[in-house]
Amino acid sequence: DDEKEIEERFYCDLVFGTAGLRGIIGAGTNRMNIYVVRKATQGLANYIIKAGKQDKGVAIAYDSRRMSPEFSMEAALCLAANGIKAYRFESLRPTPELSFAVRYLDCVAGINVTASHNPPEYNGYKVYWEDGAQITPPHDQGIMAEVKAITDFADTKTMDMVEAKKKGLLVTIGSEVDDAYMGELKKLILNQDAIDKYGKDLKIVYTPLHGTGNIPVRRILKEIGFENVYVVPEQELPDGEFPTVEYPNPEAKEAFTLALKLAKEVDADLVLATDPDADRLGCYAKDSKTGEYKVFTGNMSGSLLCEYEVSQMKEKNGSLPADGAIVKTIVTTNMVDAIAKYYGTDLIECFTGFKNIGREILRFEQTGKGTYLFGFEESYGCLIGTHARDKDAVVATMALCEAAAYYRGQGKTLWDAMMDMYEKYGYYVDDIKTVTLKGVEGSKKIGHIMNILRANVPEQVAGYKTKVVRDYRLEYIRNIETGEVKPTGFPNANVLYYELENDAWLAVRPSGTEPKIKFYYGIKGSSYDEAQKESAAFGDKVMDLIYDILEK
């Protein structure tokens, strides 16, 4: 009878955005429930039929969250009722395997029921297109328009499950796709001999954080020769309540509490955690000098994997492909730029969101120009290989363990290898500050910050001189010293990026999905400790600048 609660649940529709749906599970048009899922699927079906691709099926996966199996079945039966074959996994699977399945089964699209690392009351629905990447223009806008056009739930179709199976419109998938996916991962191993030699001695602690990673991660590690894998027992089994963590996010230190406790008990070399849909990976490794476990940021683990993969590809093949490319998002560490320069590969930048990295792979395939070597973003997601077109923490776990075996052969831990990289390329430290400004007022304030920064380019940021400003909304790049102006060559987006002296930078970006504005930044210091201090001071000064703007 709570009127406020009723209003909250029905005052608007849960918006189907560029990333699909994400919301709190419950009754109401502003919640995640079978009706909202059916409406989204009907919109997708209408788009597929209008594109004339209804003869190709749709792959469907889901994670360990509340209602995930039910929502995925609802989506499958809606597609079946529209005459589109649904290939639904028999049980929970990681996001990257869904991305793989879309292409493996020659589907037109994929649906993944997941809310990644959100709190337990949330669930979500992500759509993939036939290349296996999350939808990008023009498909995202086209599908959104079709979903929006459905104004009555009576216009959505569904079908009896038994009938759908009898008609061959609902097909259950499982071990065949699993085996094919595992086979693709094994092809990406660069140093099986290092695993054979040192993998047995390596002690690895792993937690799937109650999600989808447990079976595939343990399977791949076991099959390639890692015998000492200790799984955190309290977090091993899928559980949509995520009872042992406040927030099942491998970026959060708290998510590692139980894993680090186990690591100390078994004297592990490496501590790994995948998020509930197993597309992002967090990592700790032992510092051989002090014996303590050190945390890797997403930028650090991504850079380490990038260096390992590219250096070993070169060693194995004698050289790298002439058109070899490393892909990163614009807010990812500049250490990658230094790696690309050192190995003479192309460096391609794109906007945040892994679908944009997936889009670059598609461009390489369509044009025949560009060989994908490695891609990653700062938010703990990377992709080795092109079997999937989304972040893949299963392959990243495999590769990090392989790298740990390789460096062990040189008497080093992964942390030691990271320190060597800093010596080689410079002490790059990157971080992010987020300011939350809720409601209509908050939205105005975020707009105000962007307008002020856009109209008055700061001569310096945190004491670093501004060299180049990139305005992705006004679509220009301006060199402050020479006055030269050129186009960004990027799609339009409300993002500002300042290239500063000494390889420092700042990027400002309002979140597309939350009432937040994000400030990503990076500096390059002369030692590890000094760079950490410098980065902290830089972040404080950026916040001072922003609060000054808000007070005006």
Show which residues each predicted segment covers.
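Short Gly/Thr/Asp-enriched flexible loops that form oxyanion-binding sites at enzyme active sites
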Residues: 71-79, 122-129, 279-299, 336
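N-terminal small/polar loop signature for handling phosphorylated ligands or for N-terminal nucleophile
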Residues: 59-122, 222, 227-283
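Gly/Ser/Thr-enriched, mixed-charge loops and adjacent short helices
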Residues: 5-14, 123-257, 262-263
